[in-house]
């Protein structure tokens, strides 16, 4: 496994292809590999037409051990299974993706939970994110969630910012 090249997991079959994240990571020149549980082979949105992997078997082996999960709560367990199958050892559940059963399954599989509920795009730096993400970052700063330690307990009562 490489130190670079995280796996970005989306699911176009339920409307959760991470087009904004895909575009932002592309603009920031981050190395990543997008796995779509819905079977897309090309990206959508502002970076349309770029390579997307429709199955774990299609992913290059040189990705890092981190998977960013950007799916509906109903597909979160399937995304965890895919991350594990891909050889990832760490998972980050983006906002509105945290489902307690998926978090429990990740732990059963020995995966480290990096974060539950915060969008990783916000941590790229202000100059690299679109206006909508900047507004989201501002709301995180206003509510104090920006500086909080990583959230890894799926059962804690909290609000996820959208």
Protein language model regions, located:
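Short acidic, glycine/proline-enriched helix-loop-strand junctions
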Residues: 61-63, 99-124
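A short helix->loop->beta-strand "cap" motif at the edges of active sites that frequently abuts
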Residues: 4, 29-30, 86-90, 109-111
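Glycine-rich adenosine-cofactor-binding loop
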Residues: 3-20
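A charged, well-structured terminal subsegment
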Residues: 123-162
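Short catalytic-loop micro-motif centered on adjacent basic/acidic residues
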Residues: 8, 67-69, 89-93
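ADP-ribose/adenylate-binding Rossmann-like module
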Residues: 83-106
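NAD(P)-binding Rossmann-fold cofactor-contacting core
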Residues: 16-17, 22-46
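Glycine-rich, highly charged phosphate/nucleotide-binding loops
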Residues: 45-78
